[in-house]
Amino acid sequence: MLRTFRLGGIHPPENKLSAKRPIEELPLPREVIIPIGQHIGAPATPTVQKGDLVKVGTIIAKTSGFVSANIHSSVTGKVTKIDSFFDAGGYKRPAIVIAVTQGEEEQWEEGIDRSTTLVKECTLEPKEIIDRISAAGIVGLGGATFPTHVKLSPPPGAKAEVLIINAVECEPYLTSDHALMMSKSDEILVGVEILKRALGVSRAVIGVENNKKDAILRLSQIAMDYPGTEVMPLKVQYPQGGEKQLIDAVLRKQVKSGALPISAGAVVQNVGTVFAVYEAVQKNKPLIERITTVTGKHLENPSNYRARIGTPIGHLITASGGLPEDTGKIIGGGPMMGKALLSTEIPVTKGTSGILILPREESTRRPMRNCIRCAKCVTVCPMGLNPAFLMRDVQYADWDATEKGYIVDCIECGSCSYTCPANRPLLDYIRTGKQKVSALIRARKS
């Protein structure tokens, strides 16, 4: 019997329209907009000025603390401005704009290996591996964008026992990880070995949902050459890509409220991050591009693109046939955890796993009705929370009750809103309350 996590969960329609599409190369845009805060933690500090010439891989913003990440130029060109632009969350954030040099061959920084030759051997010490990952600006590519070098540096007294690779991709519509697994399986397995070496662990488990049988077969065949690494097929269930849910599915361990995965002896890394680690350590290549799914039921050409960081999302949408006439919303990410985007000028960042074009009929909110106390939201919550009560407490600004209801444990998967027969915007209220309670907790600690 296939494993899955044991608490809550739902089965929304998968709609993996681009599942069989190979990764396509995307033409370069005329300019890129590269935010300096594409990660959890402190924004990077710009190291370039207006008028500076940059190459692919030039560092344009450096870390401003331990929990931060370097930012590199994804193109050859000239810095035209450093200004504030809207991000995927609707906030104005500083970004560096680079006009792409036209009509000339791209210039890359020296030392970057652009070949596709597989490099298996890695003799670096753990600290050297982590330093290379940090220098390359690698962050979690599953959406959380937590700096990878921090994850590979457990706090004193904590010891990793197993590395879990998150290749679940449970979010409907998105197929970028699936496409990457099919095209870069050998590199991913080498990346797993590099991370095992960095953490000092002998065991790794690659968790893949059973709707990706081709990826499971391919990875399993290659994994036979790597002792201590196994591929674990998992039952299809949302939100299995959550760290705590994946740890429960793979290890049968539950991470306590407020605790980190390392408390269960686990470090979890997204499969896209693993490939980026391979490129950083074996090819000296910084994180300047990622695989992004562009999809939607009425989109002419749903695809998986290799997109340079900073590329306006409109450039990707145009490559997929342009916006359909009945477009209602453009979502950054998937339908469950993604956010509506304000403009097609918003750039691809390190965390942009997908761009979803929803038709009007699927993007119009239905009228909210009174809660009928059916408890469906409680049943499906993978964190064991009571979303209905949390929404009520947020409405009344009862922050004490909200905190006692463990609102900060919410992983914002949206299962509660999805299943609510009264169309109540549970997640919207919980997100608001979570921000407020988190701010109150930080204020108490300071």
Describe the role of every protein-language-model region.
Residues 49-62, 81:
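Short, well-structured beta-strand-loop connectors
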Residues 182-197:
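Histidine-anchored nucleotide/phosphate-binding helix
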Residues 201-313, 319-324, 334:
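Hydrophobic alpha-helical positions that pack around
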